[in-house]
């Protein structure tokens, strides 16, 4: 849609509060609009009119525009009413895009969006010192869209993209696609098309960066005029990841990634995508190379939660689907001495990849939360007595506390934790592969709880 030159005096409905909705409200107030908030929960204090979101749409004041928060389902009655009345519905990202005057890099994909968003911003900090990162990462676009900055790096979820008009970004990155959010999108094709809205396909000045697999899909079925670049492990990729030499090769530079901090092929592929995006927007290769070893990643993403006497704990609470968990574990060593902690609210996913991974010989699995109802029998059929089922994370650590501690022969003071006669563990990986909402507000709260339990557990181990 075409936004009016000024929002002053316009009555605008913000459907859904939360981080993006509240940011949109604040922006509209600053622009002297007359916003109205419609949400499930009434805020304790608000300076704008409030209506519950289950109000009959006909009872709402007449408005010129609806701004939809990403968590609101497309089937919401107010949205149907708006469509009937031909009232435009836009996203918070749409609103910010209209008012932002700088360049934009957008990042989407099933997994790795947040890390890649922060990584691109990190690589470009010398070339664009005033840049800002945000979007689905937690900093709403409308909180800084009118600032005079040269570059915004935005994480964009499928929900945000589904709700948005064409965003006309300068560079778009589509990292990967795996089964997720099908309770919302219903089919993988719908999910793919929502993600693909990040691309300005008909604009020859736009650059779209994709994985090799997504490039193949686009070449086979989609018409485009934009610049299409790929990253991956084949030599004809525009950013070729050479795992043997630990180099990433583009047409402009050969990058040494031997000192890149984040482990795993999936993180190195995200780095390849990030390098392409940084080059395309005008980043200097020498500056990008200098900054590669300095990036330390984000919390709750295969983060070292604690180490002591050879025992290690990994916090990967951001793993909310099987694709993410399996990517992280793909290059994990000493699988037979690893305890994998799974659980939460499972998504609509094929469990065969999980079973194939477990067949490799996992040390043990602890399964907690709602996932027990649908995952227990299949996992038990593969690993038998190596499966522990518990209610929650507190119970998980009670299992660990009951284990016996034994020294590892010939390795100084290193120890191993024996949970049974046949199960000895040196690494505990919390990569739930499920949503957190059965027991937590979000993956951050879940990850922080895990970190506190790790600290308590390690404090009880004598040095």
Swiss-Prot record:
Transmembrane segments: none annotated. One of its GO terms (biological process) is regulation of cell shape. It catalyses: UDP-N-acetyl-alpha-D-muramoyl-L-alanine + D-glutamate + ATP = UDP-N-acetyl-alpha-D-muramoyl-L-alanyl-D-glutamate + ADP + phosphate + H(+). Its main location: cytoplasm. InterPro entries: Mur-like_cat_sf, Mur_ligase_C_dom_sf, Mur_ligase_cen, MurD. The gene is murD. SUPFAM superfamilies: MurCD N-terminal domain (SSF51984), MurD-like peptide ligases, catalytic domain (SSF53623), MurD-like peptide ligases, peptide-binding domain (SSF53244). ATP binds at residues 109-115. It comes from Leptospira interrogans serogroup Icterohaemorrhagiae serovar Lai (strain 56601). This is UDP-N-acetylmuramoylalanine--D-glutamate ligase.
């Amino acid at each position: 849609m075409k936004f009016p030159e000024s929002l002053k005096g316009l009555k605008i409905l913000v459907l859904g509060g939360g981080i993006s909705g509240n940011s949109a409200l604040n922006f509209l107030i600053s622009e002297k609009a007359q916003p109205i908030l419609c949400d499930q929960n009434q805020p304790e204090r608000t300076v704008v009119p409030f209506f519950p979101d289950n109000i009959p749409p006909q009872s709402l004041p007449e408005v010129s525009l609806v701004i939809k928060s990403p968590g609101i389902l497309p089937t919401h009655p107010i949205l149907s009413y708006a469509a009937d009345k031909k009232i435009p519905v836009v996203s918070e990202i749409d609103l910010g895009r209209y008012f932002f005057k700088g360049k934009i890099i957008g990042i989407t994909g099933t997994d790795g969006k947040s890390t890649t968003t922060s990584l691109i911003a990190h690589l470009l900090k010398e070339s664009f010192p005033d840049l800002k990162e945000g979007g689905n990462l937690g900093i709403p676009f409308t909180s800084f869209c009118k600032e005079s900055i040269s570059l915004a790096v935005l994480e964009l979820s499928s929900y945000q993209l589904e709700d948005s008009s064409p965003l006309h970004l300068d560079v778009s990155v589509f990292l990967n696609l795996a089964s997720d959010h099908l309770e919302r999108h219903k089919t993988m094709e719908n999910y793919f098309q929502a993600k693909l809205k990040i691309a300005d396909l008909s604009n020859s000045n736009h650059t779209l960066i994709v994985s090799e697999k997504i490039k193949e899909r686009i070449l086979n079925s989609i018409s485009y005029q934009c610049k299409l670049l790929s990253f991956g492990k084949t030599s004809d990729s525009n950013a070729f990841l050479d795992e043997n030499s630990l180099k990433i090769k583009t047409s402009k530079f050969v990058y040494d990634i031997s000192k890149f901090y984040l482990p795993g092929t999936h993180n190195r592929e995200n780095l390849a995508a990030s390098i392409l995006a940084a080059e395309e927007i005008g980043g200097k290769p020498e500056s990008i190379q200098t900054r590669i070893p300095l990036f330390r990643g984000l919390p709750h993403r295969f983060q070292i939660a604690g180490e002591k006497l050879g025992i290690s704990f990994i916090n990967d609470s951001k793993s909310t689907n099987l694709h993410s968990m399996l990517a992280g574990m793909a290059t994990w060593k000493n699988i037979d001495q690893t305890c994998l902690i799974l659980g939460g609210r499972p998504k609509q996913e094929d469990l065969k990849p999980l079973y194939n991974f477990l067949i490799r010989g996992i040390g043990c699995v602890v399964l907690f939360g709602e996932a027990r109802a649908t995952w227990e029998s299949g996992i038990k059929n593969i690993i038998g007595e190596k499966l522990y089922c518990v209610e929650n994370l507190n119970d998980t650590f009670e299992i660990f506390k009951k284990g016996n501690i034994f020294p590892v022969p010939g390795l100084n003071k290193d120890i191993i934790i024996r949970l049974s006669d046949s199960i000895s563990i040196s690494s505990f990986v919390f990569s739930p592969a499920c949503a957190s909402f059965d027991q937590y507000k979000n993956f951050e709260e879940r990850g922080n709880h895990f970190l506190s339990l790790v600290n308590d557990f390690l404090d009880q181990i004598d040095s």
